Amino acid sequence: MVNLHSLPQGSRPNAAIRNNGPDSLALERLKLRELAEGWPSYRDSCEWENFESIFHPGAYVYTTWSGRVAYQDFIAASKAGMDKGAFIMHRCHGSSTDINVDGTRAVTKLKATITQRFEVGGSEFDVEADCRFCFYFEKINGSWGARLVKHWYEKDKMIPVNPAKFPQVDEDKLKAYPPGYKYLAYWQETAMGIKVLLDMPGHRRHVGTVNLEKHDELYWLAKRWLEGEQIEV
């Protein structure tokens, strides 16, 4: 049985600095936090030029609704979705960064809540998904930028705007979605008419699912990145 309280043995990048360390690396970690928090701050406010500054050329992002796309295509899809009524916001809850001793590669994990507003059949409600962003950063010519951004989707829920009005949920259909983002996936497909990825990284407790496998893979990928390997984005 999977150990629910521990990460995969050996997945910790032992040579990386995670806190304390030299003041110079603490400053770099502060820069990386600013970049990571830029995703929700810039995207939610439609500050697209600022949003672009997070990435290096050739970077990719993965989300439930977009799949794997180049960051420029993600921006274009976000704009198109907003014009069709998609209303997605984020709340940040803290971050941590592992950085290599040379100060050239880092992985920043940002705890956040994705909150998406839906209106179905006269019922207005939010779906909130607790997640962690995972940014793979690299410093080139003195500037940090993301090469890859993925998420762990850990748990979600529905919140009615008016408790007297709540939409009907098809319980059988709901069971087909991943445990970490089942309501988000259900309503993105039902209300937005899109196909959601069902194999996004989840939580350690999602035993017997591909989402647990992807959870662990993301940690191993971070270790390889911090140890200088080339990774497929």
Curated annotation (Swiss-Prot):
Compositional bias of kind Polar residues: 1-12
Pfam families: SnoaL_4
Location of region: Disordered: 1-20
Signal peptide: none
InterPro entries named in the record: NTF2-like_dom_sf (IPR032710), SnoaL-like (IPR037401)
Domain of life the protein comes from: Eukaryota
Family assignment from sequence similarity: Belongs to the PEP2 family.
Function: Contributes to the ability of the fungus to cause disease on pea plants.
Protein name as catalogued: Pea pathogenicity protein 2
